[in-house]
Swiss-Prot record:
This is Agamous-like MADS-box protein MADS2. It comes from the Eukaryota. GO terms for biological process: flower development; positive regulation of transcription by RNA polymerase II; regulation of transcription by RNA polymerase II. Residues 88-178 form the K-box domain. SMART domains: MADS. Probable transcription factor involved in flower development. One of its GO terms (molecular function) is RNA polymerase II cis-regulatory region sequence-specific DNA binding. One of its GO terms (cellular component) is nucleus. Disulfide bonds: none annotated. Keywords: DNA-binding, Flowering, Nucleus, Transcription, Transcription regulation. It is found in: Nucleus. Expressed in flowers and seeds.
Length: 244
């Protein structure tokens, strides 16, 4: 006959309870070992008795590593999913805030353009009027400053052009003076007469006068005395003896 079904309830007899605990504990540890060997599974078993005594089995090298792995698998997913939900809720709140701000800006823009003024009360209309006046002052101030900047730029450009014009005028005057002097010099050479030019050239180049008489020990008185008879002889047709 087979063994009857055991009712699962606390064993009241203390001795029987201890005996059953020891048998079932050993059987559970054996089953855990067999499971880890047969199926190549990482198995960790922790048992505390009623007196607080610890019984454990771990198929890996360290029970702590198995517990850390268990903690990552069990609580890590919860911790990851929790921030994602919080981030989603925070993003949705931020979206609602931005949407409300965008709608408010759209209403303000329409009011500044003179649209949808019906729902506004007197205080809101006065505030809108002050905003428009302030905006108009800023626009006018910006426009005035822009025009002043443009005027300053134009004045600087005008000054540069004036200086350039003065420089060009001085250069043209110098060129005109040079051309006038050159034309005056050329016209003066062309109008000068040929005789005057020849006289000038002769003034520069004076030929030397040669006397065929060799005047060694020259005496002016003697020469004059000799020249008179010689002239007379020449007239009579006689040749002087010193010339033979």
């Amino acid at each position: 006959m087979g063994r009857g079904r055991v009712e699962l309830k606390r064993i009241e007899n203390k001795i029987n309870r201890q005996v059953t605990f020891a048998k079932r504990r050993n059987g559970l540890l054996k089953k855990a070992y067999e499971l880890s060997v047969l199926c190549d599974a990482e198995v960790a078993l922790i048992i505390f008795s009623t007196r607080g005594k610890l019984y454990e089995f771990c198929s890996s090298s360290s029970m702590l590593k198995t517990l850390e792995r268990y903690q990552k698998c069990s609580y890590g997913a919860v911790e990851v999913s929790r921030p994602s939900k919080e981030l989603e809720q925070s993003s949705y709140r931020e979206y609602l805030k931005l949407k409300s701000k965008f709608e408010s800006l759209q209403r303000t823009q329409r009011n500044l353009l003179g649209e949808d003024l019906g729902p506004l009360n007197t205080k809101e209309l006065e505030q809108l009027e002050r905003q428009l006046e302030t905006s108009l002052k800023q626009v006018r101030s910006t426009k005035t400053q822009f025009m002043l900047d443009q005027l300053s730029d134009l004045q600087n450009k005008e000054q540069v052009l004036v200086e350039s014009n003065k420089a060009l005028t001085r250069k043209l005057d110098e060129i005109s003076v040079k051309n006038h002097l050159q034309l005056s010099w050329e016209s003066g050479e062309q109008s000068m007469p040929y005789g005057h030019q020849q006289a000038q050239s002769q003034g520069f180049f004076q030929p030397l006068e040669c006397n065929p008489t060799l005047q060694i020990g020259y005496n002016p008185a003697g020469s004059s005395q000799l020249s008179a008879p010689s002239n007379a002889q020449n007239v009579n047709g006689f040749i002087p003896g010193w010339m033979l």
